[in-house]
Swiss-Prot record:
The gene is RASAL3. The modification Phosphothreonine is found at T234. The record marks R500 as: Arginine finger. Keywords: Coiled coil, Cytoplasm, GTPase activation, Phosphoprotein. It is found in: Cytoplasm; Cytoplasm, Cell cortex. This is RAS protein activator like-3.
Amino acid sequence: MDPPSPSRTSQTQPTATSPLTSYRWHTGGGGEKAAGGFRWGRFAGWGRALSHQEPMVSTQPAPRSIFRRVLSAPPKESRTSRLRLSKALWGRHKNPPPEPDPEPEQEAPELEPEPELEPPTPQIPEAPTPNVPVWDIGGFTLLDGKLVLLGGEEEGPRRPRVGSASSEGSIHVAMGNFRDPDRMPGKTEPETAGPNQVHNVRGLLKRLKEKKKARLEPRDGPPSALGSRESLATLSELDLGAERDVRIWPLHPSLLGEPHCFQVTWTGGSRCFSCRSAAERDRWIEDLRRQFQPTQDNVEREETWLSVWVHEAKGLPRAAAGAPGVRAELWLDGALLARTAPRAGPGQLFWAERFHFEALPPARRLSLRLRGLGPGSAVLGRVALALEELDAPRAPAAGLERWFPLLGAPAGAALRARIRARRLRVLPSERYKELAEFLTFHYARLCGALEPALPAQAKEELAAAMVRVLRATGRAQALVTDLGTAELARCGGREALLFRENTLATKAIDEYMKLVAQDYLQETLGQVVRRLCASTEDCEVDPSKCPASELPEHQARLRNSCEEVFETIIHSYDWFPAELGIVFSSWREACKERGSEVLGPRLVCASLFLRLLCPAILAPSLFGLAPDHPAPGPARTLTLIAKVIQNLANRAPFGEKEAYMGFMNSFLEEHGPAMQCFLDQVAMVDVDAAPSGYQGSGDLALQLAVLHAQLCTIFAELDQTTRDTLEPLPTILRAIEEGQPVLVSVPMRLPLPPAQVHSSLSAGEKPGFLAPRDLPKHTPLISKSQSLRSVRRSESWARPRPDEERPLRRPRPVQRTQSVPVRRPARRRQSAGPWPRPKGSLSMGPAPRARPWTRDSASLPRKPSVPWQRQMDQPQDRNQALGTHRPVNKLAELQCEVAALREEQKVLSRLVESLSTQIRALTEQQEQLRGQLQDLDSRLRAGSSEFDSEHNLTSNEGHSLKNLEHRLNEMERTQAQLRDAVQSLQLSPRTRGSWSQPQPLKAPCLNGDTT
């Protein structure tokens, strides 16, 4: 491609500077290159000051290298003629032009066709069949719009790979911000290439021809499953630059049965490629889209964001729901997107699978179809929905979830699913410049203001969008580090709360670890987790769930599995992500500065094991470690292993709550030192392996559009006070939504809220930065050695008094001649007053201490439309007396104090309310105690009366007993008298009259009886 002409370049640059042109934006057509940049850098220079100007470079860059593509350079135009690779390379070698010759005017439209103003709406291509050839992208490289097969790999379906090559852009991403020290700013990539580059090209061409010839030769053996030798030779010369309508689409793993695949389609053909990881796939998709869709970031487009949760189905016929199983398929406008795993059973069918798609073209209808697993099976039922209903304002924020009746199925058949769709309007990337700047500079302020106002789901979505945007700009690592430190300060050193709550910090850390540690999870847990999911061995150790005879065998099996998982984790330090190591090291340093060094390992443990490794073991399908949810038996095994690993990381033995796991306490004691050593290793920064600079990739405009839509939804329900503290973000969001230019600039530091300003001033802290509009709120610091006159002169906004103004000395006229005169050395004289400064001149000496002199800029709006700058343009009274700003400053301080007192009053009122609530509770408790006391008193009285009655009864019985004893004594005495009387009668002589006269007896007893 020929370089753009200077005339065209001059047309693309604006003549006057404006806030939108403070940064240099690169377009796909013919913009100029950034000075000395290796990367696509629309947002790479946000860290510098807004007024910083980049050095100008030549508008005619040198020829570019064929092996390395500068990402910050404008992409290539689509080629109209099919050029052979060898012809292009040898032509470059034989005739290296030092400067490109200008082409004739009649050939310019033919070589560089103008991009279409309204490109055709892309449609989702037809899904590939399961037996389609899938090519390993590790054997390819991207050279001049061609996917060139380097060779050395035999055809084989879905074979594992150890390493992987990458495209030119991927190589640059892996290298970080490395720059050659000998390279001057403004040189392009071919200028730094050595002379051995052509010889390397010769060797490459020779090897390509030899391998092509070897592949074309007939060989003995069975044909490959991926295709014939001719198909491989055709693919080795695939020139995508000569094709029309080249599109790149990521493929869901369920379509081909293999993860991390993408499809390249063009008019008349398509190819499928597999990658080693999701990060590698994203880099390849980005590089290919930059190559074949160069204007994607510079045009407005509409894309669809879709999330579908397929839960369960009911009411299907027994014959249909039986073996071999039923799948649920997702169709969008007649194109198959994904399918669930097969489920079989006589009752309800459970899937519980989630599908998420981004960057889909505008679509109208979504269809969920239930289909049998057998070949050529018919559709058992379907659900058809219009996406306009799901994207309507009245649609629920969490999505539409219900039982959808199945069309074409028996009555009562239904599918339970949750669907959430959103149509995004993606603007050109330069329209989001201010939004990206605000997020880059003030993400901590934004998270702190929105934290108490968001539910858990909104926090998760906002944190994911922020992490993706900042990862694309290279600032996600700083975001996670700062939020983790803030979470540590919020918890106040309480270990039980570290990373266990649903906050923006925890959600951001989860999203960042999922993005960074995908390869790490695959390398560490992928193989062992897949083996455990496929195993049929039982590891249940709960005595209530397994026989006692099998319990020792199950315990030994679980211990061996935990040993295997733990060994893979502690030996994974060699491929541990360096980005996470830097974050963990920063957290430990923050704990050390706070005097709580013990919390450093706890932070690492809570983030790495509690939020990443153990959840990946529990739910491997959510982290890409398994294609489907495990069966109940393996799921129970994974749950027990996750419990053991988590307790080992927390150094917490099993207690009475899980007494059946007590046999694993010896395992925890044995491997505790190794776990502590691993936590120390991952928190150490390896300088050689640590990444530097930009590490992100992806569609930044799309991620910014998602973030803009979420923030608009959040700010629509936010209170006005919180909005004011986040200015100018609401103004930026409103301008982007209305399609108006953003007329504000993002400061490097936002002013503190009034309460924080008062607290910082009362604590004796000096403000680091203050906006000009906030200067009247603060009294300048005055030392005791300054005189009154110097104090008056040093006042920030006071004008000099009329009596202090000195007459201006008129400059001496300068006479010029035709020749340059010899100037005599000027004598230094005492100035009688300040020189008049002409309009537009620069101040070379110390500025006077009066109000700064400024002039209007033609690039800025003369009447600011933002509310916080209108008061600065209001005319002020020129006759304002000296020191009138003092009461204003004092009033501002008093207002701050009043605001602080109001806050204290609110706190005290809340305290009084809480105390009154406690008093009411104590009063109610006292009433209850009184009632209980009365009840006890009544019961005591009743008991005492019963006791008295029983006591009276006992006294009567005693009296009766005494009477009986008395009667017994009387009877004994009477008996004794009778005995004596009988004896006396027996001894005395009887007379005649004695037999007829009886002896007199004693008086009767007291009770009236006679004896």
